[in-house]
């Protein structure tokens, strides 16, 4: 993104991003599992904007688009973006039917059309390339600290607080409930978290993400956050919940007594984790 911003400044253009939805793996069979996106389109757009990108274009990726040759893709760019000044991609960029085009192909297309081109090498850290694939693996493993180190920010859930069963309130641990089912899910379980409200105020807490096996179970997963300080908001509040550390997997308890004892232990552990942040 920095290279794109710099190129835009050099050419008097706007820094824009062209991205696809759904992910091409959901349209073009590869024999592998679908790629699960870390964030939905609206959050990706917000993150691009926060990093200085002025325009975000979402292109619907379908079979017709997947069938374009590299030259046909170039024609698409010329028609869609008649004032295009330059393109920035990763060095391992592939495009066109059956991935027929690569960074070298695109560089030639850019030369033929008078566009600038830059292929940016991937960043290496911790003995490997920083990539969305690597970040997804860290999320699935519950390694929130390494994810944050590589991504430059904590992984977070976003949404609006909804009403719940209010069971937590009866055992001394009221929660703020967020229905949340991203494509790329972290493990079900308990996390030390930091909740940020719509005004930007942060609250430390502990959260359970899962399907409530101890109290009847849920069809869709729920993120239930207990805050260590009483918030002045409730249902309807737009919040962000940052995952700081995975504490333990979700488990089923025979009754409320051991569940309550475990929640207290989880709170103590989360406070210990958060005090070191």
Question: Model-flagged regions — what are they?
Answer:
Residues 1, 164-277:
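Phosphate/ribose-recognition catalytic cores of enzymes acting on nucleotide-derived substrates
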Residues 2-32:
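ATP-dependent adenylation/pyrophosphate-handling site
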Residues 14-16, 85, 116:
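Residues at the starts of beta-strands that form the adenosine-phosphate
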Residues 17, 58, 119-120:
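A structural preference for short, hydrophobic beta-strand core positions in alpha/beta folds
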Residues 22-113:
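N-terminal Rossmann-like or analogous alpha/beta NTP/dinucleotide-binding catalytic cores
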Residues 48, 87, 147, 193, ...:
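Residue-level signal for inorganic ion chemistry
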Residues 110-211:
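Glycine-rich, Lys/Arg-enriched anion-binding loops that position phosphate/diphosphate groups
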């Amino acid at each position: 993104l920095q290279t794109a911003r710099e190129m835009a400044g050099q050419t008097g253009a706007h820094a824009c991003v062209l991205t696809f939805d759904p992910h091409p793996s959901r349209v073009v069979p590869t024999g592998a599992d679908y790629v699960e996106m870390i964030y939905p389109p609206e959050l990706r757009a917000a993150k691009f904007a926060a990093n200085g990108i002025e325009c975000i274009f979402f292109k619907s990726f379908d079979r017709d688009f997947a069938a374009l040759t590299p030259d046909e893709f170039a024609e698409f760019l010329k028609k869609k973006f008649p004032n295009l000044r330059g393109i920035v991609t990763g060095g391992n960029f592939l495009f066109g039917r059956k991935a027929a085009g690569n960074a070298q192909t695109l560089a030639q297309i850019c030369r033929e059309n008078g566009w600038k081109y830059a292929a940016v090498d991937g960043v290496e850290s911790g003995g490997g390339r920083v990539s969305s694939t690597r970040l997804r693996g860290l999320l699935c493993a519950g390694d929130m600290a390494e994810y944050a180190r590589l991504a430059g920010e904590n992984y977070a859930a976003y949404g609006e607080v909804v009403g719940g069963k209010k069971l937590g309130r009866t055992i001394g641990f009221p929660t703020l409930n967020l229905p949340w089912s991203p494509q790329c899910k972290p493990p079900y379980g308990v996390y030390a978290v930091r909740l940020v409200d719509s005004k930007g105020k942060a609250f430390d807490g502990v959260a359970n993400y899962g399907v409530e096996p101890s109290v009847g179970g849920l069809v869709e997963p729920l993120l239930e956050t207990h805050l260590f300080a009483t918030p002045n908001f409730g249902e309807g509040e737009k919040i962000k919940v940052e995952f700081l550390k995975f504490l333990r997997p979700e488990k089923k308890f025979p009754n409320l007594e051991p569940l309550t004892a475990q929640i207290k232990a989880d709170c103590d552990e989360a406070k210990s984790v958060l005090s070191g942040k």
